[in-house]
């Protein structure tokens, strides 16, 4: 698999130079040199994979999945480093070799597009939970995230960043392709496709879906307790006082987008998603 340097003018040079292009997809530098190893990564039937485009509610989803699958409670999760329990496949730490040796059942995360995930996943050898988020809220959160980084800090304006998003020029490539690839596989027996907004609109149904998908059996009282704990996680994650400008809430984009930006975004969205029947709630 060939890798080539990607260079796109009109963005801060420091930010731009960090990325590379792999089979037409812009990827972060820590993915360089390991994509073949990722494709060949051995999966297990007991694995549970959480896959998202960045800033799609990954942190919240991983906590809910951990709670449902492990029977943990929110206080316990709050005291642990959950990222150690659910490593990201392509990140430098802990690395592929260590993830390979983790005891089963492994919980593994990734932001990679469907086509770059381990080939065994395509054969249905492990369970995959994918969560998508409406792209307007996502791009605001992604911008705030990049502004906060030290090594990959983005110093341009939100308008510039949003244009990059619409033109598929951010890390992990096109959001539009990312979600549509997984949407096409939503009926696969080993795939559960979720939407971030449903955590806020109908958490009960989502928890029930997760429990069934993960093979977790519980009586009515246990399910009610599980749902109550998940509500606590959602409330903690989306507390507007705890996060910059209420980063986890639905409809965040309305505080940031101008009328002109929104019109341009809607046009691009229609062009790139027009043939797809996947829909999103942009506010609740």
Curated annotation (Swiss-Prot):
Spell out the coiled coil positions from the record. Answer: none
Keyword Phosphoprotein in the entry? The reply is yes
**Which molecular function terms from Gene Ontology are attached?**
identical protein binding; sulfotransferase activity
In the record, Phosphothreonine modifications are located at 8, 11, 205
- SUPFAM superfamilies noted in UniProt: P-loop containing nucleoside triphosphate hydrolases
Entry EC number(s) = 2.8.2.-
- Signal sequence, start to end: none
Q: Which GO terms describe its cellular component?
A: cytoplasm; cytosol; mitochondrion
Key words, A-Z: Cytoplasm, Lipid metabolism, Phosphoprotein, Steroid metabolism, Transferase
Biological process per Gene Ontology, one example term:
dendrite arborization
What does the record say about tissue specificity? Expressed in the brain, not detected in the liver, kidney, spleen, heart, small intestine or testis.
Kindly list the places in or outside the cell where this protein is found, as annotated in its UniProt entry. Answer: Cytoplasm
Q: Please state the protein's primary subcellular location.
A: cytoplasm
The cross-references to InterPro entries, in alphabetical order and at most eight, read: P-loop_NTPase, Sulfotransferase_dom
Q: Which Gene3D superfamilies match?
A: P-loop containing nucleotide triphosphate hydrolases (3.40.50.300)
Which stretches are transmembrane?
none
- Biological function: Atypical sulfotransferase family member with very low affinity for 3'-phospho-5'-adenylyl sulfate (PAPS) and very low catalytic activity towards L-triiodothyronine, thyroxine, estrone, p-nitrophenol, 2-naphthylamine, and 2-beta-naphthol. May have a role in the metabolism of drugs and neurotransmitters in the CNS.
User: Into which family does the record put it?
Assistant: Belongs to the sulfotransferase 1 family.
Q: What is this protein called?
A: Sulfotransferase 4A1
